[in-house]
Amino acid sequence: MRIVVTGGCGFIGSSFVNLINKVPNTEIVVIDKLTYASNPFLIPKDIPLIKKDICDITLDDIGYADYIVNFAAESHVDKSIHNGLPFVKSNVEGTFNMIEIAKQIPNLKKFVQISTDEVYGDMESRRIGEADEHTSLEPSSYYSATKAAADHLVTAAGRTYGLPYLITRTCNNY
């Protein structure tokens, strides 16, 4: 099993890499831009690391993948309020680029989009206790809006091109 993990040097991405690294017969390649939120020392030294923005990834970089797990994102809500452009570039354009490449990988088993519960908006004011795949998206920051846009792009690629995909919307971890 060959897995490409984008954003694999981030807090959650690196935890995933360390967990999946325990699975026998698994080859992992991490792609990370190595921004303020990354730490390459969080992943094992024997796992290949490509320092690259996901907007610049090519088929030559990941065309062998069985699975793509897309953790890469600008994720600081407060930073998105003051400057949304980096969020649009990474979360929307970067995800779009990854999708376009994934569509060209003949044996890709799954494109896993790591999203956020922020796409649902303020659950308290909406008086919703739980969200599921049918809950409407009501993002309230550029961060959550760009993650919702990325989710829609992944879904559209699945419906239009048959891209095998899964979207997870995790909640805040700490």
Which residues fall in each region the model found?
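N-terminal Rossmann-like NAD(P)+-binding domain of SDR-like oxidoreductases, especially those catalyzing
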Residues: 1-173
